[in-house]
């Protein structure tokens, strides 16, 4: 049963989606619920794997596990692409970013991309030869696979603490920056970046809590502990939260399609993480590709101007370090009259701008001023700390042929900008809303004795006035929250936009009476026992995987 107006096709306005991930199994940790729902909506979904995941287990094991998992989510083999680069290892021992700058990496005797059986690597399938294990080779193939398919949206693993995750995040942003800065480029996909670890694979073991909870950051698994996520630029309250289909929620893990897909990756012992991966929302951070700066010419008073428009808000070289230092990402002018300017060949419509500064706290812009060719100007500052977004909104400006930013007052030696966004609109997606209880996405929520749940509404953007209904009767949010505390029977809570009722969401709220508490406890125990039993049944074949040498050996184990 549909519980909201949200859909990937209509809300995001897309017909195709590409998910780019570092290893086989990260497709589920990063975007499993999105893959499943997008396929169900008829969106053409492709999954691209950067490495063969061949650090411990043979590539043919990882490939087969992935194809079986994705088949459960609706993605067939022809829509799965393996770039064929080596797993970088636990400390980047075979990373093409760390060791493939001057010559190909030697990964167990291999120096080129490869496939197994009837699966060939991307470069060989397209060009008839394998790609060298080099950083430039990875960038070339990643750019090629994106431009060959030109998906409407991309979902990409971000800067988790694993070396390969960090490498993919950096590689993708370099490639995307290259694409967007090409003269005459018209390709501006939606880009969503999300984590596979601290909000998913190694997050809280909370699946069997009273309520189905939304994603949270497990700070013990973070490396940038003074930041809100492992990408220091991101702010938690600016994440995009997508609702999750019922098949990806339960009831129980044994009936959860994502659970069934995740445990296909037996080599990774993923069954030990199933209580952590699945949440009531799927979270990403939106990266704007409609930035008008890519259509202009940037000049600066001093410093490296390309850092202002390279699509990289951060960059690190020593990605095997626990907490890599940020390098080569910041426009940092060193003259007295510090300024940057963007000139456009054609007049532009501008509604907002965003500035991103120094991540590491060694300097910050305190005061600055934007000036437009039409005489409009606006003072800004101080910029947000830790490189966070400073969003500047103003009345829409038309006919703009140039914009200039003059830096006034600064502090520290490292004051500068990592990125400058000039935005033609404040938002890029159609509005959607989701009912929340105590901040968690609510679908079927039971109120336990002594609880005082607070109902609210999430939206990814600023929205108009809301209309709340309880069992079809209009009600104020204050009165709704008052009644929910003492709810006596299962009720339907609905919220919709007053000026656009086609944007709506519903949730079922019911009392957790003694019968419900008893039956749900029994079901929970049965489900946990089922998962435990599957775990026991998996142990022996998992140990055998470590000793296999051939595909036929593998087939005998999984039969």
Walk through the language-model features, giving the residues of each:
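Metal-dependent de-N-acetylase/amidase catalytic core
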Residues: 1-20, 41-44, 60-71, 75, ...
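Aromatic, loop-rich ligand-recognition surfaces of beta-strand-rich domains
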Residues: 321-432
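Short, solvent-exposed loop/linker segments at the N-terminal edge
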Residues: 441-451
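A short beta-strand segment in extracellular, disulfide-stabilized domains
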Residues: 451-459
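Surface-exposed, flexible coil segments in extracellular/virion-facing regions
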Residues: 472-482
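Solvent-exposed segments in extracellular or luminal domains encompassing
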Residues: 480-490
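Edge beta-strands of extracellular beta-sandwich domains
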Residues: 501-514
């Amino acid at each position: 049963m549909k519980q909201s107006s949200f859909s990937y096709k209509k809300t995001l306005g897309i017909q195709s989606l590409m998910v780019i991930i570092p290893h086989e199994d990260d497709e589920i940790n990063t975007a499993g619920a999105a893959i499943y729902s997008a396929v169900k909506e008829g969106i053409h979904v492709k999954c691209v794997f950067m490495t063969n995941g061949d650090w411990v287990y043979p590539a043919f094991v990882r490939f087969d596990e992935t194809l079986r998992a994705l088949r459960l989510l609706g993605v067939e083999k022809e829509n799965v692409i393996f770039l064929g680069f080596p797993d970088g290892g636990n400390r980047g021992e075979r990373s093409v970013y760390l060791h493939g700058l001057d010559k190909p990496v030697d990964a167990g005797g291999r120096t080129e991309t490869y496939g197994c059986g009837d699966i060939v690597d991307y470069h060989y399938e397209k060009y008839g030869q394998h790609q060298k294990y080099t950083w430039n080779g990875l960038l070339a193939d990643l750019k090629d696979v994106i431009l060959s398919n030109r998906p409407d949206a991309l979902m990409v693993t971000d800067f988790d603490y694993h070396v390969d995750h960090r490498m993919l995040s950096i590689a993708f942003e370099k490639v995307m920056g290259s694409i967007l800065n090409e003269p005459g480029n018209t390709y501006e996909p939606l880009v969503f970046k999300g984590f596979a670890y601290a909000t998913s694979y190694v997050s809280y073991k909370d699946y069997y809590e009273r309520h189905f909870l939304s994603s949270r950051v497990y700070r013990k698994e973070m490396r940038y502990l003074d930041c809100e996520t492992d990408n220091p630029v991101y702010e938690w309250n600016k994440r995009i939260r997508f609702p999750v289909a019922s098949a990806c929620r339960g009831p129980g893990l044994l009936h959860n399609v994502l659970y069934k897909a995740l445990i296909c990756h037996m080599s990774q012992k993923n069954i030990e993480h199933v209580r952590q991966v699945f949440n009531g929302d799927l979270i990403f951070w939106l990266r704007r590709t409609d930035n008008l700066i890519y259509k202009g010419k940037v000049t600066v008073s001093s410093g490296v101007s390309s850092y202002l428009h390279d699509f990289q808000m951060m960059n690190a070289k020593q990605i095997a370090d626990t907490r890599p230092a940020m390098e080569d990402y910041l426009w940092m002018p060193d003259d007295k009259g510090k300024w940057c300017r963007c000139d456009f060949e054609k007049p532009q419509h501008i509604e907002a701008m965003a500035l991103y500064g120094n991540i590491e706290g060694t300097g910050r812009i305190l005061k600055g001023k934007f000036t437009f060719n039409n005489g409009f100007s606006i003072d800004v500052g101080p910029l947000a700390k830790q490189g966070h977004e400073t969003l500047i909104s103003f009345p829409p400006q038309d006919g703009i042929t140039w914009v200039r930013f003059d830096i006034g007052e600064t502090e520290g030696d490292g004051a500068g900008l990592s990125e400058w966004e000039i935005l033609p609109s404040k938002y890029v997606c159609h509005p959607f809303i989701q009912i929340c209880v105590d901040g968690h996405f609510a679908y079927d929520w039971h109120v336990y004795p002594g609880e005082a749940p607070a109902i609210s509404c999430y939206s990814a953007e600023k929205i108009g006035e809301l209309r709340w209904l309880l069992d079809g009767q209009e009600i104020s949010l204050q009165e709704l929250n008052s009644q929910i505390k003492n709810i006596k029977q299962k009720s339907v809570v609905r919220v919709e936009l007053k000026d656009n009722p086609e944007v709506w969401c519903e949730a079922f709220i019911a009392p957790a009476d003694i019968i419900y508490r008893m039956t749900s406890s029994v079901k929970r125990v049965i489900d946990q026992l089922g998962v435990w039993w599957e775990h026991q049944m998996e142990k022996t074949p998992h140990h055998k995987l470590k000793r296999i040498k051939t595909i036929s050996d593998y087939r005998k184990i999984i039969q």
